Amino acid sequence: MAKGNPRKRAAATKDKWKMKEWYVVYAPDFFGNKEIGLTPADDPEKVIGRVIETTLKDLTGDFTKGQVKLYFQIYDVKGQNAYTKFKGHTLSRSYIRSLVRRRTTRVDGIFNITTKDGYKLRVMGMVIAYRRIQTSQERAIREIMRDIIYKKAEELNYKDFILEAVTGKMATEIAKEARKIYPIKRAEIRKIKVLAEPEA
């Protein structure tokens, strides 16, 4: 089967790249409108919808936050600038594995919440307790997670809720209350997913 001239194929590929332009991608305002990457396209419409991954360390310069992965989706392009909205976050698998050791107990909680200004989110919390704990203690810790997360959703708008979750402030409050039940190693908001935005 004829494959065509390799030089022509290479030239065609090169021409396609020549037609593309680079767009500078920016984080939302509550993450400081910081530049988070570059993305190429031959049409600005093709940039819309792309998801850019970065870390909280890259945004803040805090080297202790490299495990916090942030996802931003491009929704608007003006000139060579692409603007994003927060899509979700996760903790790296390697970081979670480092917390969960033998003779510890991992308590997970998954909560669908609505922020004060109407954003619907799925929030996944996690508490790591030293040693094995009783089922009743697990249940009590999960209740603490739920109560704090729901209370925050009632009190905070979307932007403030996200910031408290990804920076660790919310997890610190969970840890403080959970320690009244049993000594714990760590509390984390391990994942957030935006389910729906309020109707305009």
UniProtKB/Swiss-Prot annotation:
> Per its record, what are the GO molecular function terms?
structural constituent of ribosome
GO-annotated cellular components = ribonucleoprotein complex; ribosome
Matching entries from InterPro entries are given as: Ribosomal_eS1, Ribosomal_eS1_arc, Ribosomal_eS1_CS
Keyword Methyltransferase among UniProt keywords? no
**Gene Ontology BP annotations:** translation
- Protein keywords: Ribonucleoprotein, Ribosomal protein
Database matches in NCBIfam families: PRK04057.1
Similarity-based family: Belongs to the eukaryotic ribosomal protein eS1 family.
By its UniProt entry, which HAMAP family does this protein fall under? Ribosomal_eS1
Designated name of the protein: Small ribosomal subunit protein eS1
Species per Swiss-Prot/TrEMBL record: Thermococcus onnurineus (strain NA1)
